[in-house]
Swiss-Prot record:
<dbReference type="InterPro" id="IPR011063">
    <property type="entry name" value="TilS/TtcA_N"/>
</dbReference>
<feature type="binding site">
    <location>
        <begin position="64"/>
        <end position="69"/>
    </location>
    <ligand>
        <name>ATP</name>
    </ligand>
</feature>
<protein>
    <recommendedName>
        <fullName>tRNA(Ile)-lysidine synthase, chloroplastic</fullName>
        <ecNumber>6.3.4.19</ecNumber>
    </recommendedName>
</protein>
<dbReference type="Pfam" id="PF01171">
    <property type="entry name" value="ATP_bind_3"/>
</dbReference>
<dbReference type="GO" id="GO:0006400">
    <property type="term" value="P:tRNA modification"/>
</dbReference>
<keyword id="KW-0436">Ligase</keyword>
<dbReference type="InterPro" id="IPR012795">
    <property type="entry name" value="tRNA_Ile_lys_synt_N"/>
</dbReference>
<keyword id="KW-0150">Chloroplast</keyword>
<comment type="function">
    <text>Ligates lysine onto the cytidine present at position 34 of the AUA codon-specific tRNA(Ile) that contains the anticodon CAU, in an ATP-dependent manner. Cytidine is converted to lysidine, thus changing the amino acid specificity of the tRNA from methionine to isoleucine.</text>
</comment>
<keyword id="KW-0547">Nucleotide-binding</keyword>
<dbReference type="GO" id="GO:0009507">
    <property type="term" value="C:chloroplast"/>
</dbReference>
<dbReference type="GO" id="GO:0032267">
    <property type="term" value="F:tRNA(Ile)-lysidine synthase activity"/>
</dbReference>
<keyword id="KW-0819">tRNA processing</keyword>
<dbReference type="GO" id="GO:0005524">
    <property type="term" value="F:ATP binding"/>
</dbReference>
<comment type="similarity">
    <text>Belongs to the tRNA(Ile)-lysidine synthase family.</text>
</comment>
<dbReference type="InterPro" id="IPR012094">
    <property type="entry name" value="tRNA_Ile_lys_synt"/>
</dbReference>
<keyword id="KW-0934">Plastid</keyword>
């Protein structure tokens, strides 16, 4: 009896353990599935709460074929039915690495799988620096948006990209405006014919980390294109990603990513408020009869010094685009530095004649 009883108890225990193991597996699968649904819910909430995009609109996705941009495309396709979006994909090939010519073929198959139209652009000249590549990509996106009437441009920037950009800006000595890193929503101003238009750029993945997207992409077995340049330690951003951030997590704070993301969000709010104030002040400029523009310099006597460069930068971007649209970012920046360093002047700076005294700043185009 004892032996049989012991055998029955042992058998029941083994059955109970087996059932408990099955329950644990089911619970794990359920939690994993819910976490995948959580990503989609966070993504849709970001579109709603941040006011990024409206329903029934045309949305162009800047896609590199990598994890972030393909996951962005997949999430948008999942919500496409409810939001009635019209989606399109554009791929910009910088010709920076060997094998990049194979990426468009893979991306074309991905777009065919999702039922999304796709376009490809190849750089006609050799791009040496990352900033040159970014400027070229923006020009391509502007041209595609204006030609095919895309109302929004969406990029795959994540919370991890935001943190890396914040650290990069801090390490190179940026102002509070630069510390706000990447924003949820920006606008891209471009010239189309004789009119200037503004195209919204949205980043709906800014609340999701790269690790969460990797798990999501692996769960759905999304077809991704591998970019070996992301492992190149000669690129500063990669050193921040693979060396600095792991060091900070290990030796400083395991939650450093969350804290830096909060810092980026707070500085973004503060900088947006400062920009609003400076924009209102900047509206005091006047156009003068000889085709020039003047700005009341005397207002700087009653304004904090920290706002001077912001106000001047907004003013220069507004005024010089009409005086000389080809002046460019670097030309505007050079004039900004020149104005901040001199008290009074009457001189020519490139194609712009500058006259500055205690009360007024005047600028005219030299013909």
């Amino acid at each position: 009896m004892k032996g049989g009883r012991v055998q029955v108890i042992t058998k029941n225990n083994s059955i109970a353990k087996h059932q408990l193991g099955e329950y644990a597996v089911h619970i794990y699968v359920l939690l994993y599935y819910l976490s995948m649904r959580e990503i989609l819910r966070e993504f849709e909430e970001a579109c709603l709460l941040q006011g990024l995009v409206s329903p029934s609109t045309r949305l162009l996705i800047s896609c590199s074929g990598g994890q972030d941009s393909v996951t962005l495309l997949f999430l948008l396709c999942q919500l496409q039915t409810n939001w009635t979006w019209r989606l399109g994909v554009v791929y910009c090939n910088h010709m920076w690495r060997y094998g990049s010519i194979e990426t468009p073929a893979k991306l074309a198959r991905i777009c065919l799988l999702f039922g999304v139209s796709c376009s490809f652009s190849v750089s006609g000249s050799r791009l040496q620096k990352e900033e040159e590549g970014r400027s070229w990509r923006l020009r391509v996106l502007c041209r595609m948006s204006s030609i095919h009437s895309w109302f929004y441009i969406s990029t795959g920037h994540t919370a991890s990209d935001r943190i890396e950009t914040l650290l990069s800006n801090v390490l190179r000595g940026s102002s509070s405006s630069g510390m706000r890193s990447i924003n949820w929503y920006t606008s891209l101003d471009t010239q189309v014919g004789h009119r200037r238009i503004s195209i919204p750029i949205i980043r709906p993945l800014l609340g999701i980390s790269r690790l969460e997207l990797r798990n999501y992409a692996n769960r759905w077995k999304l077809p991704l294109c591998y970019d070996p340049s992301n492992q190149d330690q000669r690129i500063r951003r990669n050193r921040i990603r693979h060396e600095l951030l792991p060091y900070l997590r290990h030796w400083w704070n395991p939650q450093i990513d969350r804290l830096l993301a909060q810092t980026a969000e707070v500085t973004s709010w503060e900088s947006s408020y400062y920009d609003l104030i400076c924009t209102q002040i900047c509206q005091q400029y006047e156009w003068i009869g000889d085709g020039g523009v003047r700005f009341p310099w005397r207002i700087f006597h009653s304004i904090p010094t920290s706002l001077h460069s912001r106000i001047l930068w907004i003013f220069l971007n507004r005024a010089l685009v009409f005086l000389n649209p080809a002046h460019g970012f670097q030309g505007n920046f050079d004039i900004l530095q020149f104005l901040l360093e001199t008290k009074t002047c009457h001189c020519r700076h490139g194609s712009i004649y500058i006259s500055k005294d205690v009360d007024w700043l005047r600028m005219t185009l030299v013909k």
